[in-house]
């Protein structure tokens, strides 16, 4: 018989309420042993919780959920008593004395919910993300993932891929049926539609990943542009040494901050110039390494220097050398010395913010800009949360879609296109964990009258 698991569902320590959760075939037996009866399904019952000698350990609310109508899909019993840890430990010890009961592993209740098709993998992960959410936006987005918004988008993509595979494999396996879908433009049009759909989901998932894991912001620029002063201003403390000596920062400095609950990883780097010694050279190499891994780059300019007044000169010196796929915000620092007013404008496709890191003038504008860059929305109607593994799976799927497009349009290779689509489907299924090869087989026989 399958084991029954039990664990404390509330955080350890003192509290108003403490909850033990039991899941498995012996949940009813636990109820009769500890409560003297099993409550009616989905009905709260106020009862004493007793030890093996019949002595009352505590009294509280008991809830019973009969399979499959429970979180795990199994029989579930919840005992909600007072939040004293000693009482909860005694009650847990009593339950574990029963044969066939064991302590649950971390996350095992959610695992059972997944195995019993109550949740897919993305939804199960969203439970942890909801618990760990550091902002209202993150919590709402995690809830949307838990409710299946991300999974639904992935499943729609999978359905589209299966539909296309159905046609392609029919053309390969049943040529006598005069199904020659590779000969017209319908397959390519449908493939292009899937590529477009996937690009939209990838964009949303990347935003959701930043919201969950934090945006990596790298401060870059010439020496003595005020990069370390900006790090200190954003961090709200003296995290970096600031002097008038160019090249003070030799190594990478990191600060983890929150703006209205939105997590940011701020990276201060060595000034970009021709190195004067080996230590500075190593620091500059590390700076470029951080730049290449950034989610956003803050390019610091000294607004008192004449060369920085011309954006074209800045473009030739810095912007053309920065990774083209990473968004760049130009920060004109030292407004207190140049006499410029704080402000934010769009110029030649770049956001340009004028501020003074020393006096904090304009820092609020930068904070708001970074917050909006992470997807912060005042109406809290943002999308779903996503993890790095989701992004990797979507990236792999996109790669194989593009390879499939090449096989179709350049080589007219139906077998290779079908193989690329199979790989796309497998990578997408890694997100939800719901794919089986029987899905495709059933689709072929139900969609076509082969042999008619």
Curated annotation (Swiss-Prot):
GTP binds at residues 224-229, 243-249, 268-271, 333-336. InterPro entries: G_TrmE, GTP-bd, GTP-bd_TrmE_N, GTPase_MnmE, MnmE_dom2, MnmE_helical, P-loop_NTPase, Small_GTP-bd. It is an enzyme of class 3 (hydrolase). It comes from the Bacteria. It is found in: Cytoplasm. Residues 214-375 form the TrmE-type G domain. Keywords: Cytoplasm, GTP-binding, Hydrolase, Magnesium, Metal-binding, Nucleotide-binding, Potassium, tRNA processing. The keyword NADP does not apply. Its EC number is 3.6.-.-. (6S)-5-formyl-5,6,7,8-tetrahydrofolate binds at residues 21, 78, 118, 452. K(+) binds at residues 224, 243, 245, 248. This is tRNA modification GTPase MnmE. Pfam families: MMR_HSR1, MnmE_helical, TrmE_N. GO terms for biological process: tRNA methylation; tRNA wobble uridine modification. Its cofactor is K(+). GO terms for cellular component: cytosol. Binds 1 potassium ion per subunit. Belongs to the TRAFAC class TrmE-Era-EngA-EngB-Septin-like GTPase superfamily. TrmE GTPase family. CDD domains: trmE, TrmE_N. One of its GO terms (molecular function) is metal ion binding. SUPFAM superfamilies: P-loop containing nucleoside triphosphate hydrolases, TrmE connector domain. Homodimer. Heterotetramer of two MnmE and two MnmG subunits. Exhibits a very high intrinsic GTPase hydrolysis rate. Involved in the addition of a carboxymethylaminomethyl (cmnm) group at the wobble position (U34) of certain tRNAs, forming tRNA-cmnm(5)s(2)U34. Mg(2+) binds at residues 228, 249.
């Amino acid at each position: 018989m399958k084991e029954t698991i039990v664990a404390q569902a509330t955080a350890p320590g003192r509290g108003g309420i403490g909850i033990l959760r039991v899941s498995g075939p012996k949940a009813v037996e636990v109820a009769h042993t500890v409560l003297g009866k099993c409550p009616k399904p989905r009905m709260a019952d106020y009862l004493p919780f007793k030890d093996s000698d019949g002595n009352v350990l505590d009294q509280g609310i008991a809830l019973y959920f009969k399979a499959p109508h429970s979180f795990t899909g199994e029989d579930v019993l919840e005992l909600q008593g007072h939040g004293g840890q000693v009482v909860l430990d005694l009650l847990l010890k009593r339950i574990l004395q029963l044969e066939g009961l064991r302590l649950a592993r971390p996350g095992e209740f959610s695992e059972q919910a997944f195995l019993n098709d109550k949740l897919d993998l993305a939804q199960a992960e969203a439970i942890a993300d909801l618990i760990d959410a550091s902002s209202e936006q993150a919590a709402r987005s995690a809830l949307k993932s838990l409710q299946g918004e991300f999974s639904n988008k992935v499943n729609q993509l999978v359905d589209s891929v299966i539909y296309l595979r159905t046609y392609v494999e029919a053309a390969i396996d049943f040529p006598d049926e005069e199904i020659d879908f590779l000969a017209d433009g319908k397959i390519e049009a449908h493939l292009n539609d899937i590529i477009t759909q996937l690009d939209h989901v990838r964009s949303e998932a990347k935003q959701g990943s930043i919201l969950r894991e934090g945006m990596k912001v790298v401060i870059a620029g010439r020496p003595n542009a005020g990069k370390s002063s900006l790090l200190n201003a954003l961090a709200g403390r003296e995290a970096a040494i600031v002097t008038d000596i160019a090249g003070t920062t030799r190594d990478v400095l990191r600060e983890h901050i929150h703006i209205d609950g939105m997590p940011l990883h701020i990276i201060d780097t060595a000034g970009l110039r021709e190195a004067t010694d080996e230590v500075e050279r190593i620091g500059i190499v590390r700076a470029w390494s951080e730049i290449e891994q950034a989610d956003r780059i803050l390019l610091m300019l000294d607004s008192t220097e004449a060369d920085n007044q011309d954006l074209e000169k800045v473009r030739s010196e810095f912007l053309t050398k920065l990774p083209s796929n990473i968004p760049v915000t130009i920060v004109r620092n030292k407004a207190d010395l140049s006499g410029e007013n704080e402000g934010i404008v769009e110029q030649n496709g770049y956001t340009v913010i004028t501020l003074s890191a020393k006096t904090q003038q304009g820092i609020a504008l930068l904070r708001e800009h970074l917050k909006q860059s992470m997807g912060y929305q005042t109406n809290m109607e943002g999308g779903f949360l996503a993890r790095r593994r989701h992004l990797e799976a979507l990236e792999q799927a996109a790669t194989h879609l593009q390879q499939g497009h090449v096989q179709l349009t350049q080589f007219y290779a139906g077998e290779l296109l079908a193989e690329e689509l199979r790989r796309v489907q497998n990578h997408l299924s890694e997100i939800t964990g719901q794919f089986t090869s029987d899905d495709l087989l059933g689709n072929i026989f139900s969609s076509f009258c082969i042999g008619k």
